[in-house]
Amino acid sequence: MVHAVIPENRDQYRDALLQMHRDRKTIFVDRLHWAVPVVDGEFEIDQFDTEQAVYLLALDPRSHRHLGSVRLLPTLHPHLLGDVFPDLCAAGVPRDAGTWEITRLCTTPGLEKAEARAVLGLIATALVEFALLYGVYRYTCVAHLQWLSQLIAVGWDTEPLGAPQQIDDELVGALSINVTPATLQM
């Protein structure tokens, strides 16, 4: 089951959020070698993990263990694309109340491939449901070209925001994803 962690219920998910930050450190720092902040040697927490951030957490229904997650940021507040990678957008960074950014999508290290795919599917559905419930009509994201290709392959209505650029020996691009009720059927 996927839980939407919003400012009003964040205290109820304290343990799950710590697990998420621990898993993010394992994936993004230990495996992918990203130069991002690490708190207390075990938690990947950056400047965008603020009160405005919303987290969609896939949790094991019995143990409530973190299985996967994504961070959502309203683009009217500081966010990765707008504050770190604005050059990835040819016509400027999209910023409005109905545009949110997807960042830090991950699954728990050690999941079998089939289970990780299932968790990502649950998170994808939750992204669309969250958008429809909260008036989000567009998501933006920054990702390595391989991830962007996988997002496009899902069949969602996507648009590149600019040409991919070489950043730290990787091709990185920005993408927008238009969300409508029909997106749930994809």
Please place each PLM-identified region on the residue numbering:
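C-terminal catalytic domain of photolyase/cryptochrome flavoproteins
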Residues: 182-186
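Acyl-donor binding region in acyl/amide transferases
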Residues: 80, 86-172, 177-181
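Short, His- and charge-rich active-site/binding loops that engage polyanionic ligands
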Residues: 59-92
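Short connector loops at helix/strand junctions that flank enzyme active sites
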Residues: 51-53, 67, 95-100
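Short, hydrophobic/aromatic-rich beta-strand segments within well-structured domains
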Residues: 56-58, 71, 127-128, 140
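A short helix-loop-beta-strand connector motif used in the catalytic cores of GNAT acetyltransferases and
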Residues: 47-57, 80
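Short, solvent-exposed loop/turn elements at beta->coil junctions and helix N-caps
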Residues: 40-47, 162-165
